[in-house]
Amino acid sequence: TYINRWPHIKWLLTVANDGANSIFRALRDNTDGAQDRFLSEIVRIMEKYPWCDGIDIDLERGDGYSTHTESTAMFCNIYNTVKAYDPAKHMNICLPGMTSVNGSVGGENWCVYGDLDAYCDTASIMSYGMAWAGSAPGPVSPRSWLEGIYDYATKVMNPDKIFLGMPAYGWNWQIYDTPENLGKTYRGTSNTYYAAKLWMTGGYNFTDDAPPQPFLPIVAYWDDYDKAPYAFPHVYDYME
């Protein structure tokens, strides 16, 4: 098995709300016993999969700073439940990128790093997503933002607990017209690096292969400050 083959790897079971605010809110407020059921289910799956080293909690799209006390209490209850079942079980929590208290660019101000430090063994900070499907084109993890997250997190949390997430994806933004006129909600579509390469080499095109365009002119640019590559497809004129 993989576990026997790589015994140095910790295997965690991810429990997530898939970014549904309604689920986060119900768990936080224990609506109709939602949090009680959630905690009992965590115990159930640890019993079902005894080989797991612990739990990875990925709860996203919480609410504003006014809910931070209740949100912290929820994570406290999760942590205590895991440790009561087995103190050796590892608990990782996934946290939004923040540069200060009440400093989320995405409205995730329920999260206060310093308050959550006591209720995790490790914390994976989602330090990516500054640029996203609905934003203007730009680096997914701009340097100043990434450094701000690092500086804040290491001051209020145990640095040995912290893992920073790095983006392994990019975006293809359509900027020649508004999303409304294109029949889309957002102007951006996520890409792997391989997909981005296919755009640049003509594997993908904007004509849906009718007819295909074998030679797609691009301008490529490397932002050495933010360490981010850019590619501008369909540039037919000189660019300086």
Cite the ranges covered by each PLM segment.
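Residue-level marker of positions within ordered structural domains that often coincide
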Residues: Y128, N158, Y169
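Active-site segments of SGNH/GDSL-like serine hydrolases
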Residues: L95-M98, M166-G170
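Charged/polar, solvent-exposed surface patches and flexible loops
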Residues: S40, R44, A118, G148, ...
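Short, conserved beta-strand edge motifs with alternating hydrophobic and charged residues
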Residues: S124-M126, F163-P167
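Glycan-binding loop/region signatures in secreted carbohydrate-active enzymes
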Residues: A168-E240
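Helix N-cap and loop-to-helix transition residues
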Residues: T31, V112, P142, N158, ...
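Catalytic-core region of carbohydrate-active enzymes that cleave or remodel glycosidic bonds
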Residues: V140-I162
